[in-house]
């Protein structure tokens, strides 16, 4: 019997053993010499987070999307001016941040961040049991923040853009000495229209009405004929989603567009001034323009990015990081496709506004992140150049020979202090 084939089998086995031994030598266990790729990312063990990380670290450690956000083609032609938001906010001067709080957009949480979570020279004074905080400028008895949790509903419950822009300057002049010029920086929060609509339905179902809202426009509130109520009695408790959607005068429909648009452009709440086909494009265009020109707006679905952009816009830092909470009442609603389609149809203007807002928001975020990375690269480049120049200058310095040390001939004992 021929044994040569059996001998040839040992050759590849020995080769494999040789490769394995060599690999263990070149790439020992736990070594950093070799990396393996999964897809396009290196597989590695992330370093342990520090006990008290800065907010910048939190962006990188807890949200991997932050460092490399997906770049998608935009359907909107935003200019660099649209993307640039760098407010020279002077908290010690006459500048005022005005928070436009749209229902069920996470505004309550964001409003609390403004009064409790900003690192300030003179923090807001929030006393237990009180709904409002005192947010004064350093060394002055003047407020720098106009919001629910600082000045209260001074312009009416959930006042909209039309109300605030006409009311805030008057209120501020009444409460504080009139100024020749105050800078009012308007901010707001937006939310996915379907989620926001469902959240409002759930809130109304539990008894909320907001019936004390003024809805002031062109100097007056709407009449009962212009804005009829959707229910009889004190509230709409227990309302079904079908009934909620069936009310044609339900202000939940396209609420975000209505609260951000200049309603005086369409005759306020008087629907007889123009038909719907004329009214809707004007409202949407006005809401987009006002939103784009605001100092800042955030999105409920992007809490960390909202925090990041606010900090970079106003040059104010939050003490603790924002938290993304996706387990909401709206998220727990089981919604059929036909029901979702109807909600989207009822909120068609809000759907278009949110698409616009989300695109602009993410582009602003990418723009600021890219600008920061460029500044960091330039800073590192300048540091390296400074180090190189320093080394060159040191190499050109003349070498001084060590001089012979002069030894003293005095007796050591004479140098000892006698106590």
Curated annotation (Swiss-Prot):
Result, substituting residue 101 to A: Significantly impairs catalytic activity
Q: At which positions is 3'-phosphoadenylyl sulfate bound? A: 101-109, 191, 199, 323-325, 329-330
Q: Which residues form a coiled coil?
A: none
Enzyme superclass (EC): transferase
Q: Extract the Gene3D superfamilies matched here.
A: P-loop containing nucleotide triphosphate hydrolases
Keywords (alphabetical) are:
Glycoprotein, Membrane, Signal-anchor, Transferase, Transmembrane, Transmembrane helix
Its subcellular locations are: Membrane
Task: Identify its membrane topology class.
Answer: Single-pass type II membrane protein
**Which residues, renumbered to this chain, are glycosylated?**
77, 270, 275, 326, 393, 402
For this protein, the record's Pfam families field holds: Sulfotransfer_2
Q: Which residues lie on this side of the membrane: Lumenal?
A: 29-419
Tissue expression per record: In early somitogenesis, expressed in presumptive forebrain and midbrain, tail bud and Kupffer's vesicle. During mid-somitogenesis, ubiquitous expression which is strongest in the somites and eye. During late somitogenesis, predominantly expressed in eye, hindbrain and ventral somites. At 24 hours post-fertilization (hpf), restricted to lens and neural retina, brain, otic vesicle and somites. At 36 hpf, brain expression is restricted to telencephalon. At 48 hpf, restricted to telencephalon and pectoral fin.
Q: Which reaction does it catalyse?
A: alpha-D-glucosaminyl-[heparan sulfate](n) + 3'-phosphoadenylyl sulfate = 6-sulfo-alpha-D-glucosaminyl-[heparan sulfate](n) + adenosine 3',5'-bisphosphate + H(+)
Name the residues that span the membrane: 8-28
Any one GO molecular-function label of the UniProt entry: heparan sulfate 6-sulfotransferase activity
Enumerate the residues binding substrate.
131-132, 148, 153, 158, 203, 210
Enzyme Commission identifier(s): 2.8.2.-
* GO CC field: membrane
PANTHER family reported in the protein's UniProt record: HEPARAN SULFATE 6-O-SULFOTRANSFERASE 3, HEPARAN-SULFATE 6-O-SULFOTRANSFERASE 3
Q: What is this protein called?
A: Heparan-sulfate 6-O-sulfotransferase 3-B
Q: Which organism is it from?
A: Danio rerio
Lineage, highest ranks first: Eukaryota, Metazoa, Chordata, Craniata, Vertebrata
